[in-house]
Structure formats: C-alpha cells, structure tokens
C-alpha cells in the first residue's frame, strides 16, 4: 500500500491533572487533549490538534514507531525525542501564525477559491501518480494513516495556505531587491572554485579519534614514517572507512555532506599532505589529501546570470527571515509546553 507523504496518525498521550480543590486526578479525554492550547500568538490559539496533525509531527511519530515499536510511549528516549522535536515543530507553527496574521493585515492572504482549486488539482495528481486514479485504493490508504478524505483535504488545504501565504509575503518583502554588477563580480572572485569547467575534486583519507591528544599521537606516528592506512586500520573510530585504511574516496570541493570544519581542513591541504589535528563535530581528524583534480574557472560572463539568481535568492531569504523575526519580537507569544505531549 502506498504511503501518502509518510503520513500516520499521531497517537494521543494521556495527560493527568490535579484539581485545585483536592487530590482527585482527572484524566483528559482525547477530545480535551486535542483542544488543549499549546501556544497563543497575539490571542490566537494553536491547539494540540494543530500540532499533532501537522505533517512533520505525523512523520516524527511514524519514525519513532519504526525505531521503538508501538509501545514507544513507554520508552524514555522515545518520549524525550518526541518532546524535543515537537517543540521545534511548534516554533514553526508559531512562525506560520505570525506570518499569516501579518499577511492578513497587509492584505496578502491567498485567494481561497484558487487555494481550493489548487488543492483539488494536486490531490488529483497524487491519486493518479500513486493510486492509478483508484478512489478505493486512495481512501483505503487514507484510512490506514488515520484520515478520512475530508480530514486529509483539510490538512492539505491548511499546508497549502501556509505555503502560498509565505510566497506572497516573500514576494512583497523582496520586490525591491537589486543585485549590482559589483556584487556579482565580488561573489565570483571570492567563489571561483564553484564555477570550474568540471567540479574540483580531492581524494581523501582520514583517521578519526576522540581527543586532541590522541590525534597528536597519531600525527607523530605518521611523521615518524608509519603507513597511514595501517594506522587508520588500527586506531580510527570511523567504522565506515577504517577497514579501507581511512579511504574516503573522491570528494567534491563543494560537498555539503561533510562537516564544514573537516572540509575546511581538507581544502587547505596540498596534494600528498597530511593535516595537523582537525576538530569537527565528530571528534579529531588527521586528514590526508591523496590527490587533487582542479579545473579551469569559467569566465564571469558565462556564470553571471547564475550568480545573480543565487544572490537574489540569498538576499531574499535573509530579508524575509529578518522581517519575520521582527514580527515575532513585536508579537505576544506564550507557549504551554506541558501540553505538547
């Protein structure tokens, strides 16, 4: 059965409260939990239901169930993971609420008729691509994930409204952005390695240890002539590469999959060189640059439009983020974190 965007029903966790007049414990019903307030933004409530029905929460619960099983609520690590992640999701919902309120004030809300039309079009595409236009299969999949067609459409419409509201607000905020030729030239001169005829590459190996002292001892052994691959197999704590002598294969200069500090240390090496200890979020590395492949840089004229688009996007994102933070600071926001789970 197809999974609809990895959606799943969020299990409601029972919450107990003490009455103010005595020690009688009252267990909230699922309906009461769903209606409980998790945050208020300028007087508008965000309910537990809003939080639990958010696709990010649904995906979170699906992943937790896969890792910890159906009885995940009995596992302290699982509960802590859910709480931490739901706090982040709630922050996003608060931001969305602030943006929606400001959009209403600025008359930037999307047209509801168009929204509903877009929703129907996208759901129809979903049915066609994933269920061969079979309504029965589609509804069975919805039911398995805890949705009726009506509740799924309501969730979908809400997400689409948030997306289109942000798009309209972004367009309004960033409409006067200009990128000068000097900005383009400066960016090009600073980032020439991004604009080569082919991606610049380096063949790397590394040895990972926990402490700087361990890394210094490893470096001394290498400086004294010991074989890099042999030492890596002996002491490296990177289980994915140690059996290959620490070999990481070919890595592009702009590879974002590696720790930024690790990449900075690697890029600073000449071919054949071995680094001093490099600290990253994983520990301390001794990095060896086995080989470098560098290619000619494209002319500015060939990449000018590409750079302009990049700078416009960067400026737009920065400006919108700054403006939203201003709106949030000017808002009255309260969170009731005890109601999150």
Swiss-Prot record:
Membrane topology: Lipid-anchor
Subcellular location: Cell membrane
Keyword Aminoacyl-tRNA synthetase set for record: no
Protein name, entry field: Foldase protein PrsA
One of the protein's GO biological processes: protein folding
Catalysed conversion reaction: [protein]-peptidylproline (omega=180) = [protein]-peptidylproline (omega=0)
Domain of life: Bacteria
Signal peptide: 1-22
Pfam families noted in UniProt: Rotamase_3, SurA_N_3
Reported function: Plays a major role in protein secretion by helping the post-translocational extracellular folding of several secreted proteins.
GO MF term list: peptidyl-prolyl cis-trans isomerase activity
InterPro entries (alphabetical): Foldase_PrsA (IPR023059), PPIase_dom_sf (IPR046357), PPIase_PpiC (IPR000297), PPIase_PpiC_CS (IPR023058), PrsA_foldase (IPR050245), Trigger_fact/SurA_dom_sf (IPR027304)
GO cellular component: plasma membrane
Entry keyword set: Cell membrane, Isomerase, Lipoprotein, Membrane, Palmitate, Rotamase, Signal
UniProt gene name: prsA
Lipid-conjugated positions (S-diacylglycerol cysteine): 23
Keyword check for Transcription: no
HAMAP family: Foldase_PrsA
Segments forming domain PpiC: 199-291
NCBIfam families according to UniProt: PRK00059.1
């Amino acid at each position: 059965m197809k999974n609809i965007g990895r959606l799943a029903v969020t299990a409601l966790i029972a919450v107990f409260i003490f009455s103010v007049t005595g020690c009688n414990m009252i267990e909230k019903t699922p309906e009461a939990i769903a209606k409980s307030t998790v945050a208020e933004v300028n007087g508008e409530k965000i309910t537990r239901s809003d939080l639990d029905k958010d696709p990010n929460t649904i995906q979170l619960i699906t992943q937790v169930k896969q890792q910890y099983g159906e009885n995940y609520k009995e596992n302290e690590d699982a509960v802590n993971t859910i709480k931490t992640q739901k706090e982040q999701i709630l922050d996003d919902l608060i931001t969305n609420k602030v943006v929606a309120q400001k959009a209403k004030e600025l008359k930037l809300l999307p047209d509801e008729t168009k929204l509903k039309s877009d929703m129907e079009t996208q759901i129809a595409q979903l049915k066609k691509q994933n269920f061969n236009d079979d309504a029965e299969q589609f509804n069975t999949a919805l039911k398995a994930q805890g949705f009726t067609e009506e509740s799924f459409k309501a969730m979908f419409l809400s997400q689409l409204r948030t997306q289109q509201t942000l798009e309209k607000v972004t367009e309004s905020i960033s409409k006067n952005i200009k990128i000068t030729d000097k900005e383009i030239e400066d960016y090009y001169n600073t980032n020439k390695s991004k604009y080569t005829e082919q991606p610049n590459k380096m063949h790397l190996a590394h040895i990972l240890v926990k402490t700087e002292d361990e890394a210094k001892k490893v470096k001394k052994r290498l400086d004294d002539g010991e074989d890099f691959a042999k030492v890596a197999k002996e002491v490296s704590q990177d289980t994915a590469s140690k059996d290959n002598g620490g070999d990481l294969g070919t890595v592009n200069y702009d590879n974002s999959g590696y720790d930024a500090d690790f990449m900075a240390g690697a890029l600073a090496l000449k071919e054949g060189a071995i680094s001093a200890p490099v600290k990253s979020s994983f520990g301390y590395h001794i990095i060896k640059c086995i080989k470098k492949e560098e290619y000619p840089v494209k002319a500015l004229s060939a990449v000018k439009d590409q750079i302009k688009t990049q700078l416009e996007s960067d400026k737009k994102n920065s400006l919108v983020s700054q403006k939203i933070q201003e709106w949030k600071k000017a808002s009255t926001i309260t969170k009731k974190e005890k109601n999150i789970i």
